[in-house]
């Protein structure tokens, strides 16, 4: 009964017919507890005077009612006990009036529909202080409760005091933990002042098994964390931890799983866990454990730091158990702290990839002919460059690099002095032995025939084609880009390698991508195509349109600034469109920013993927070709003087770190000499001299760590991605996630701990992409009743055993109704709307136990 309801009842009382010769209604209301003292002024009774009686105005009240106003109806409200007859100055008035009686608990119970349960009256009385506040009362009433029991009332009070959205002890505990890092835990203060501490601790003990004598929110936090640790930590549990481990751990384990893995609580949980980790000296206790003892433990971050340190030391000590390390990292991917240490794990993974590939090829490049070495780089060696690049992308983002500096040095040493050095020797020897000043290599697709090979076929068929040229997009980067594009939309994507021009620098590389009859140098060594200077976008557009009138050229940065209509207008009526993108070379070609080149690669991958989407969605592009003018070499460490080649003559047209163009045909020690007739025409009289391997010429100017222009495979293996959007009804190019099936035969749960097996039905390849699932149990209403497991189905293995997942489910300790439905839910983590991948009915028949159910 709220104020409105009290007003109605009193109004009905005053509206009743007068009997026994009475001329008016006088109603006394004694509210000794003051439960309605805030409500009395809000009453609006028609034709009734409300008079407040106090111990000090009894005579004045008697005078007012019997002398001054003998006609009005009176509600006489008294915030005091009803006086005895001897002390009651208004006894004569009381005898011909009537009394209105109610109390807060009666009103509350009546409003909540509790009319015949006297036992619950004492429960409500326990919270008299709580219900004195209108705000708290309103919060209590705001919760929808199907049936009130003593425990339910306790929980609603706790939920109200902790500002929870639902009535659930788990939510109350979470709210208390969220406040624990603050100077004062306001929710715990609320419980102490307006709730009942003893009731709270009794509920916690009953639900989670917490029974420490020294009860506090901090010790409760330790209890939850250590109980959770005990579920995954192998071997003996430290004696000092044992009092904090629940005898009925299921509910605590499920609580912890939901608390630590909820995105809204992740930061709070991490701070709490780090505080407790120090309090209970987890790191010290782990010294007596092996890595295998806590490979799936994720309560504290020291599990991850120990594992990261372990793998790092193993790699530093050249322990070649690479498969084991990758399995450990794969296991950690599903666990809580992985996101915090993502960069550390990624750096380890890429270091493993680099070391493993070099180790498996016997720490040496196989001697081969130029053609075979080119093809070997295209098929496998480029992966080492990718691992090196990705190692640094991750390493640069690690906040505390101290633990990784030695590994970084080893990565640098192995990459530079084993891989690059050996590749440089074998490749240079092969070129000198077979090519004898002749470029290009026979049998390979050549960059200087790019237009004829990859653009002219579309012109011949009068099909529209877009050519994206990204400066310094080397082959290994394009390979990653091709893989990304392949699984991002319905399309066919293929990548091939061209042999780039020599020298592999921008002016010449860009020129050979155009349709040309002649390429020449002027007296300033500037490149001309068909008598047009080829360095400007405007001139390139002219060269293109002279060959085929419906052609254009534009810079990516100009496109990026356009609105949708402007974007359409640029390509309106055009059949051949060249789009120039420059991020990698722009960053790498300057000493101040060359160390950022790998991060420029990341930006390039984003830019081109976005551009492809825009071309398809805005101008309905179908045919897109992506290529580059050249690749690049990059080493993080400063070059030694021995890596630089001195020039012995001055008669040069162009001098750069990786090449010299000259009219001199003689060779310089430490270099290779090639005629440029292949691109400039017979009798050009121009020669390019490049240092053997990855060495640089000693010249003044830009940075020396990022270079291009030479003949190393990283520079001259130029990618061509052939992308064709597919709008057909055929499913040939459909992108789809692999399937995961529940393979366990059982469809009934009889134990609080249950293991279920799942199977990735096919390996990742082609258009089949990974599937990431959250898997858990719920009741009919969708409330979670178990921990949550993560399944990452991304195996590329052909072996079924490598695509099998065995997951452990811990169910809450509660009463399960055999007649009700419970479900195993498989939720696609990456889907925002239709995220339920599968829902499997599971009857649950578990006897309530006080242990793990064994």
Curated annotation (Swiss-Prot):
Sorted UniProt keywords: Antiviral defense
GO-annotated biological processes: defense response to virus
Keyword Magnesium: no
Induction line: Part of the pglZ-brxL operon.
Signal sequence segment: none
Job of this protein: BREX systems (bacteriophage exclusion) provide immunity against bacteriophage. A core protein of a type 1 BREX system. This system allows phage adsorption but prevents phage DNA replication, without degradation of the phage DNA. Methylation of bacterial DNA by PglX probably guides self/non-self discrimination. When the brxA-brxB-brxC-pglX and pglZ-brxL operons are transformed into a susceptible B.subtilis strain (BEST7003) they confer resistance to bacteriophages SPbeta, SP16, Zeta, phi3T and SP02 and partial protection to phages SP01 and SP82G (these include lytic and temperate phage).
NCBIfam families, per database record: BREX-1 system phosphatase PglZ type A
UniProt record similarity statement: Belongs to the alkaline phosphatase superfamily.
Protein name, as recorded: Alkaline phosphatase-like protein PglZ
Naturally occurring in which organism (per UniProt): Bacillus cereus (strain H3081.97)
């Amino acid at each position: 009964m709220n104020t409105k309801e009290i007003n109605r009842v009193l109004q009905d009382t005053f509206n009743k017919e007068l009997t026994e010769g009475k001329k008016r209604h006088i109603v006394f209301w004694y509210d000794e507890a003051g439960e309605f003292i805030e409500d009395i002024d809000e009453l609006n009774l028609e034709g009734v005077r409300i008079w407040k009686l106090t111990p000090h105005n009894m005579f004045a009240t008697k005078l007012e009612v019997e002398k001054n106003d003998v006609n009005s109806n009176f509600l006489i409200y008294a915030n005091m006990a009803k006086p005895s007859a001897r002390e009651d100055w208004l006894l004569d008035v009381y005898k011909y009036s009537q009394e209105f009686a109610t109390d807060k608990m009666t009103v509350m119970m009546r409003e909540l529909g509790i009319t015949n349960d006297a036992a619950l009256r004492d429960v409500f009385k326990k919270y008299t202080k709580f219900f004195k506040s209108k705000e708290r009362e309103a919060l209590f009433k705001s919760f929808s409760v199907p049936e009130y029991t003593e425990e339910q009332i306790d929980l609603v009070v706790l939920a109200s005091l902790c500002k929870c959205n639902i009535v659930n002890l788990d939510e109350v505990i979470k709210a208390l933990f969220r406040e624990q890092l603050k100077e004062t835990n306001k929710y715990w203060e609320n419980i102490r002042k307006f709730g009942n501490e003893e009731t709270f601790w009794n509920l916690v003990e009953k639900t989670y098994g917490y029974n420490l004598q020294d009860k506090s929110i901090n010790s409760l936090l330790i209890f939850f964390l250590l109980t959770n640790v005990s579920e995954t930590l192998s071997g003996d549990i430290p004696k000092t931890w044992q009092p904090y481990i629940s005898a009925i751990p299921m509910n605590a384990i499920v609580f912890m799983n939901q608390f630590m893995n909820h995105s809204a609580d992740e930061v709070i949980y991490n701070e709490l866990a780090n505080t407790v980790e120090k309090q209970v000296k987890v790191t010290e206790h782990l010294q007596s454990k092996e890595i295998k003892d806590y490979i799936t433990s994720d309560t504290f971050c020291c599990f991850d730091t120990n594992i990261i340190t372990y793998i790092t030391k193993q790699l530093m000590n050249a322990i070649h158990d690479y498969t084991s390390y990758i399995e450990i990292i794969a296991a950690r991917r599903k666990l809580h702290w992985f996101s915090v240490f993502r960069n550390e794990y990624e750096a380890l993974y890429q270091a493993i990839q680099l070391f493993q590939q070099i180790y498996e090829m016997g720490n040496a490049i196989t001697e081969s002919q130029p053609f075979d070495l080119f093809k070997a780089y295209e098929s496998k060696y480029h992966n080492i460059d990718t691992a090196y690049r990705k190692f640094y992308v991750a390493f640069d983002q690690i906040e505390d690099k101290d633990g990784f500096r030695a590994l970084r040095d080893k990565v640098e040493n192995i990459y530079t002095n084993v891989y690059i050095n050996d590749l440089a020797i074998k490749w240079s020897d092969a070129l000198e032995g077979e090519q004898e000043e002749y470029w290009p290599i026979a049998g390979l697709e050549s960059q200087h025939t790019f237009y004829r090979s990859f653009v002219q076929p579309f012109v011949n068929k009068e099909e529209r084609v877009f050519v994206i040229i990204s400066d310094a997009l080397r082959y290994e980067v394009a390979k990653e880009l091709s893989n990304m594009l392949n699984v991002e939309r319905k399309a066919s994507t293929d990548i091939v390698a061209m042999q780039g021009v020599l020298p592999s620098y921008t002016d010449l590389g860009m020129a050979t991508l155009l349709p040309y009859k002649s390429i020449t140098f002027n007296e300033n060594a500037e490149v001309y195509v068909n008598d047009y200077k080829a360095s400007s976008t405007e001139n390139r557009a002219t060269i293109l349109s002279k060959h085929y009138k419906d052609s254009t050229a534009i810079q990516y940065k100009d496109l990026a600034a356009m609105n949708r209509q402007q974007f359409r207008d640029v390509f309106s009526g055009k059949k051949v469109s060249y789009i120039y993108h420059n991020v990698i070379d722009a960053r790498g070609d300057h000493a101040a920013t060359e160390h950022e080149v790998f991060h420029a690669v990341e930006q390039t991958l984003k830019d081109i993927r976005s551009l492809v989407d825009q071309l398809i969605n805005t101008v309905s592009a179908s045919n897109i070709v992506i290529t580059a003018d050249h690749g690049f070499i990059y080493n993080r460490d400063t070059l030694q003087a021995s890596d630089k080649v001195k020039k012995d003559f001055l008669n040069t047209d162009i001098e750069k770190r990786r090449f010299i163009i000259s009219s001199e045909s003689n060779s310089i020690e430490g270099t290779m000499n090639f005629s440029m007739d292949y691109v400039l025409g017979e009798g050009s009289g121009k020669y390019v001299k490049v240092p053997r391997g990855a060495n640089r010429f000693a010249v003044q100017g830009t940075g020396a760590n990022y270079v291009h222009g030479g003949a190393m495979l990283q520079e001259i293996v130029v990618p061509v991605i052939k992308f064709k959007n597919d709008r057909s009804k055929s499913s040939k190019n459909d992108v789809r996630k692999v399937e995961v099936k529940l393979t366990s035969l059982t469809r009934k749960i009889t134990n609080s701990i249950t293991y279920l097996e799942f199977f990735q039905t096919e390996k990742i390849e082609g258009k089949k992409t990974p599937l990431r699932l959250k898997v858990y149990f719920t009741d009919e209403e969708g409330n979670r009743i178990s921990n949550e497991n993560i399944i990452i189905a991304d195996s590329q293995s052909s072996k079924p055993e490598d695509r099998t997942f065995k997951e452990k489910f811990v169910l809450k300790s509660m009463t399960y109704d055999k007649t009700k439905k419970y479900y195993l839910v498989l939720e696609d983590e990456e889907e925002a709307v239709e995220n339920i991948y599968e829902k499997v009915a599971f009857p649950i028949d578990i006897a309530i136990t006080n242990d793990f159910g064994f």
